[in-house]
A protein has these predicted regions:
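Structural signal for short hydrophobic segments within the conserved structured cores
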Residues: 1, 48-50, 82-86
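N-terminal leader/targeting and pre-domain segments
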Residues: 1-22, 96-104
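Thiol-based oxidoreductase modules, predominantly thioredoxin-like and allied folds used
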Residues: 3-7, 25-27, 38, 45-61, ...
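Short amphipathic alpha-helix with an adjacent loop that forms part of the alpha/beta core around
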Residues: 12-16, 60-66
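Ordered hydrophobic segments in well-structured contexts
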Residues: 22-24, 50-52, 75-76, 84
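Short cysteine clusters
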Residues: 31-34
């Protein structure tokens, strides 16, 4: 799902996703590592992916406040725990991060 406004982002943040990890993936359509990361994330059945476009000016203040300068960038949330990472991670690395996130 693509998030196009801050209101949509806030609404999604307030939804109870149960046992699923919520991943906000920030990137662009032209970014090859972003596409690769998307494909890797889609292999996980226990996450929900929301995409945000780095070039969407609506989010510029959000990106600045959160010091998001590079893509791909992900904000992963599980219950009250937040994990962030930038760049491309392997499937195994993501699996380890998601397991750790659930145990925290």
């Amino acid at each position: 799902m693509i998030i196009k406004t801050l209101e949509e982002y806030n609404n999604v943040n307030s939804i109870d996703h149960g046992e699923k990890i919520v991943v906000f993936k920030i990137g662009t359509e032209w970014c090859e590592p972003c596409k690769t990361l998307q494909t890797t994330l889609e292999k996980f059945d226990d996450i929900v992916i929301y995409n945000m476009d780095m070039e969407n000016e609506v989010f510029q203040s959000f990106y600045e406040e959160n010091h998001i300068l590079n893509i791909p960038y992900c904000i992963c949330k599980y219950e009250n725990v937040v994990f962030r990472f930038k760049g491309l991670l392997s499937e195994e690395s993501l699996k380890d991060k998601f397991t750790f996130l659930r145990l925290t």
